[in-house]
Every structure is written in C-alpha cells, then in structure tokens.
Amino acid sequence: MKKLFATLALIITLTTGAFAGNENVRPEVLDAFNNQFATAQDVAWEAENNYYKVTFSYNDEILFAFYTTEGECMGITRYIVSTELPQKLKDSLKKKYADYWIADLFKVVNEEGTSYYITLQNAENKIVLESANQSNWKPFRV
C-alpha cells in the first residue's frame, strides 16, 4: 500500500485519466472529499481504473488528493519549493547532489506520515529520491 501512495504521488504530473465531473464521482467519494475540504475551490476530478484524483485550491494552495472508489483518502500531495524542506533534507541535497538541479519536488501526506519526493537532474543523469523520515534521502524504487 505504501508503494501505491508513492507511485500515485510520483505520477501526479503524468496522470492522464478521464475527466469526471461531480456527477460521475461516486457519492461516498464526494462526501469524503467535502467533509475533509469543505471550502475547496476550483475542484476538478479525474477517474482512474481504481481510484479518483482530485485537483483543487485550498487555503491558497493547489493540492491533489487521491481517493479509493469507496471514499478512502489514500494521500494528499502538493508541489513545494526547496525552502519548505526540513533542514536535514536541504543540507543533504547541498552536500550530496550539489551538481544537480531540482526538476520536481512534492510533499505527500497520508496515514503513514509525511514523505518528500524529488527529481534531480544534471547534464548526464536524472534521479528520483524519496524521504519518509525527514532526515535523509534514498533512491525511489517503484
């Protein structure tokens, strides 16, 4: 299940599911979302094979949430900037990956806690790292 969350988060920019208006989203999913994000704006749903992805604005941030077809929230993600990372993670990036630039960075919050995922690039390589403990990075493996 943990890898499902990570995989969903990692493919957030690659998701090309079918758009689903509110009328095409199961009532239990809508209820769960509305209970958690009652003041959300600009809500857009995408239906995948076995989950829903919803993109929305909440407290002046763009968030992405993933729900099972039964209405269980699998995780919430948002893009962040490097200054929002915990200090240990920032220090680790500066020390170990100084010759890379950040191509993508986001935060995932779910029942297991908070995780960070980053895509780094340089002229020769592209790597994806994850941190679930907020103190060090490890290569992301699907």
Where are these regions (language model features)?
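Bacterial Sec-dependent N-terminal signal peptides
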Residues: 1-24, 33
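Interaction-mediating elements
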Residues: 21-142
